[in-house]
Every structure is written in C-alpha cells, then in structure tokens.
A protein has these predicted regions:
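Conserved N-terminal catalytic core of the sugar/cofactor nucleotidyltransferase
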Residues: 1-10, 18-25, 36-115, 121-131
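Residue-level signal for inorganic ion chemistry
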Residues: 42, 98, 117, 160, ...
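Left-handed beta-helix
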Residues: 2-5, 209-354
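General beta-strand structural signal in soluble alpha/beta enzymes
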Residues: 60, 83-84, 113, 144-148, ...
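Conserved core of the sugar-phosphate nucleotidyltransferase
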Residues: 123-243, 267, 317, 341-342
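Short beta-strand segments
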Residues: 11-12, 61, 112-115, 145-149, ...
C-alpha cells in the first residue's frame, strides 16, 4: 500500500529528436509505444510506481502542447496536476515549480522525480530500491539520486562518483556522493568502469518537499522567489496566467548544476534494474530482445532475410521486408521512413531537419 505522503513527479516536456521518425515535436517518444507492448513510455513510467504513489499524488510537468495527450494517456491522475511550462528552461525551474505546488497541498510530501521516456526491465527491483530511498529521505534532510551500475564504457551518460568507503548508518545501500562527472571520452569511461565507484546518472531524484524547497532557497534564490511569491495563487484559476508571465524569468539550468552539485547532503543509491534512457535507436537495440542474428524487431508484419544486427520498428499492420542489411535502423512512423546505419545515428537530427 502506497504512503499517502508519497508523490511522483514525471518530467514529460522533452522532444526526443534523435528518435525520428517515431518521435517528433508534435508527438515525442514519451507518448509512443516504443517497445510494441501496448503501453506508451509515459504509461510504463507510471506503471512502475504502482504501490509507491497513489494516482491522486501523481504530477506531470510538460509543455502546453502535450497537456491533452498526458490527460488522455494517464486518465486516473488529477487533471490539475498536469503542470504546463510556457517555455523550456531545463529541469531546475520546472522542479522548483512542481515542488512549491506540491508543498501548497502537502507540506509533509516525500517526492520521487522521474523522466517520462526511460525504460526499466526489472520493475520489482526498481520498486524495492525506490521504496527504501523514500524511507531514507522521509527520515532525513538528504537528497538521493539513483546511480546505475555500468555494464559498458558508455560515453553518452553523465557519471556520479560515490564514496563507497562508508555507507549511511540508516541504509547500507546508500552512500555519499563524491562528485558528478560530465559525459566522458571513451578512455575516461573505461577508467570509470575499472574504478567501480562510478555510476550512470539516471536523472531519478528522491527528496522531501521541505528539503528540495530549502535547497532552492539556499542555492537558487532567484528561481525560488519566482514560485514562492506565487504560493497564494498556486492551485487556483490564476495559476497558469501567472506561470506564463513569470516562468520565463527563470534561468535555464539543470537541477544537476543548480542543486545537486552545490548541496551538501547528497547521496546515491547504486542500483541495477535494467535501466536505459532510450536516448537513441542503438540504446533500444541494446535493451530489447534480439533474434539469433542480433536483430531487434518491433512490428507485427516484418520479414527479414540475410539481415544482421538491425533494429526494425514499425507499428500497425504494414508489411515490411528487409533483405541484406547489417547494422541498420529501419523505422517507419506515420508515413515517414528512416533507413540509416546505426553507426551514423548521431546524424538523425540532421537528416530529419525540415
């Protein structure tokens, strides 16, 4: 049974342009059934928090253009918990916004913040880890981030270095953060793997509402003032008008730079539950089931011949035949077709520019 003070914040404002043609500005990947399982990524995100947060304590921060889509795909959450950014200002301002909104309703709230477009293969382990972290933040003034145990020298993720010499007396699986590191070179990523104290930064945060609000007061007073000054109108009909007016005043900055790298009581819980940020087609190939020839096929009517190490993605009943390819992306969505070498996928944004 979920704790009534547990709140879930889903960040759902991104575009996911590297996942073209499936993901577009009109319908980003978080609103698409990427895995071909009958559930979109944002629906799968909510599913994995079952038993942790009640539907009435779910919040989504998104773009105005996606508000109706969120309401359609997550019908059990309160419509007034869909918070709309008038413009993109990275993650710190929107986390400050939703934190003050939650505080206005539940001063004892314990919050977990999650991206909307990641995948987790082991939901049971995920829930176990999140529950123990929420217990920890409910008893302390700590900020906890989840660190994924790396299984390859990945250069596309930021890393977190943990001080593994001593765990928290309250929880033997939680350690102090030593440092945050930018996306590394291949050589540096290999060094991180050998060191074993470095973990992928998954962008999943856990804190009490009082802890995160106080952190914004101390480390980002300008951003904090924008939303603290709006406290009397949060949850009223005037909220969106005032947000539209004052949200653009906020500095565009990530919560990692704004809070995580400045605050003192920062902890990490190393975890391994089959996580991926699904940032690229290649990451989808890594995470999905493959045939004997290394192909990942998501689609109901796909035939392949002499084809190896490809990802083929087409939803619906369209027939797709692929012959003689090795290491390619073949993806079709709503009349748009991509055939691209996996080794060149970093250029998809360039290819898809209109």
């Amino acid at each position: 049974m979920a704790n009534n003070n547990n709140h879930l914040v889903i960040m759902a404002g991104g575009v996911g342009s590297r996942f073209w043609p499936m993901s577009t500005a009109e319908k980003p990947k978080q609103f698409i059934d990427v895995l071909g399982v009958g559930r979109t990524l944002i629906q799968l995100t909510l599913d994995r928090f079952e038993g942790i947060c009640n539907p009435e304590n779910v919040w989504v921060v998104t773009n105005k253009a996606y508000a109706d889509t969120v309401a359609e795909q997550l019908p059990d959450m309160p419509r007034d918990h869909i918070l709309c950014e008038p413009c993109r200002r990275n993650t710190a301002p929107c986390i400050a916004y939703v934190s003050w909104r939650i505080k206005s309703k539940d001063a004892k709230a314990n919050i977990v913040v999650s991206p909307s477009d990641h995948i987790v293969m082991n939901n049971d382990e995920f829930r176990r880890v999140v529950k123990q972290c929420m217990k920890f933040t409910g008893e302390t003034d700590a900020i906890v981030t989840l660190g994924m145990k790396p299984n390859r020298p990945e250069t596309g993720y930021g890393y977190i270095q943990a001080d593994l010499s001593t765990s928290s007396p309250r929880n033997k699986e939680i350690y102090r953060v030593d440092s945050f590191r930018e996306k590394p070179s291949q050589e540096k990523a290999m060094e991180y793997i050998r060191n074993r104290s470095y973990f992928w930064n998954a962008g999943i945060f856990i804190w009490s509402v009082s802890t995160i609000v106080n952190a914004f007061r101390v480390y980002q007073p300008a951003i904090n003032r924008v939303f603290e000054n709006m406290l009397p109108i949060l949850g009223t009909e005037k909220e969106q008008e005032e947000i539209d007016k004052h949200f653009p005043e906020c500095q565009s900055i990530s919560v990692d730079y704004a809070i995580m790298e400045k605050a003192e009581e920062i902890f990490i819980c190393p975890a391994d539950f089959g996580w991926s940020d699904l940032g690229t087609w290649g990451s989808l190939l890594v995470q999905t089931k493959k045939d004997l020839y290394g192909n990942s096929i998501i689609g109901e009517n796909v035939n392949i011949y002499d084809t190896h190490n490809c990802i083929i993605h087409t939803l619906g009943h369209k027939r797709v035949v692929v012959q003689g390819l090795d290491g390619y992306i073949v993806a079709e969505e709503d009349g748009r077709l991509l055939v691209c070498k996996l080794s060149e996928e970093q250029r998809i944004k360039e290819f898809s520019a209109e």
